[in-house]
């Protein structure tokens, strides 16, 4: 069996979801870290799409974090992220879908509204792994990236406030859905827990998150984080990371890819 290869953005919650599944299952894999915008020709050649993460598994290029986990469950069934019990499995997949649709896009919009006025932090979070040349190119293009991201992701004060509300609603639901075991389904960690925790990671910033920005959080984001630190979903996310994030299963051979030609117009809607 070929070593799986993951094409990713380092600081992305949907990418973290796929990455965590690989690590949880202890699957040795190679990671290719991309820069938003610069990633387009690389990913489009593999899938015909422009979204990451993309997993190359047994010759197939799979996009979408949920489809990646589904493929990993078939190829590497243990340790399982899908419950064996049919009712529990249905609940786990329903919750995965809920957090994918009702949390993932909205927490992203809210967080980007907060951090885009701080381009140095954005570069530290998304580009610090890249070559110096790629970092310089991104720096030169950062005003363009910011404007395009605002337009394509519909980022403005009104939409950001609505996204904040959706994020809070998802956090409240997470707290209500927790079983007495402390998990969302049954008495063990499943795809539902992994999805909820990974998608909350941009806000919670767990210490176990594998890629940390080289700069401190911008003050507005730090204040938001502090204000939510007593929320049950926030505390639960920290616990989920502490108990289940584990060590990386990445193996040698990873690359940091960039291209001189960047499609900035596609930089904003590129993860799922």
Residue ranges and their predicted role:
Residues 190, 211-219, 254-266:
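C-terminal/domain-terminus segments
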Residues 1-134, 244-251, 256-267, 271-272:
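GST-like domain detector, emphasizing the conserved glutathione-binding G-site
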